[in-house]
Amino acid sequence: MTVQTSKNPQVDIAEDNAFFPSEYSLSQYTSPVSDLDGVDYPKPYRGKHKILVIAADERYLPTDNGKLFSTGNHPIETLLPLYHLHAAGFEFEVATISGLMTKFEYWAMPHKDEKVMPFFEQHKSLFRNPKKLADVVASLNADSEYAAIFVPGGHGALIGLPESQDVAAALQWAIKNDRFVISLCHGPAAFLALRHSDNPLNGY
């Protein structure tokens, strides 16, 4: 007998008119185990520089039909890049615009992954107790110990980050000081924060 899963969005009872992806979508586009691979860095970095993660701190994304999408940073698009960077020798710090905890799309968490989940548990406190991005920006200078800024994916990156002057200032600092800027999927929406001033990414 074929069991059909519902294609109707699932209600998020924590907020009015808010929804998670349907059971069908989750069955097709998420997995309890990630495809983590290639984590072999025989000569990892041993220096003082680290990664600044600019994470999402908002849960609900308004949609065109008036409903709210219950979102955040996508776990795979956050944790797998960080797993690789950490294995390559880089520690990381997490910051959000508000200084409040990172929001994740927990419905996409690879909860049976024997490598990713221990890594997440090991670093969960960084996501639960992030720095306030404005405080980080205020301390940035040419000698700051960040090798890169990483903006994870997930629809949560669409909320607040594209309008944030602090995000713009952090990106301006990274580009001016020849640091790496890393992002994927919806994360580059944060780069729109640069549009309100001289945009070094204009034309890309």
Where are these regions (language model features)?
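Short, thiol/selenol-centered motifs that function as redox-active sites or metal-ligating centers
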Residues: 181-188
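Extended, subdomain-level signal for the structured scaffold at the beginning of enzyme domains
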Residues: 1-177, 190-204
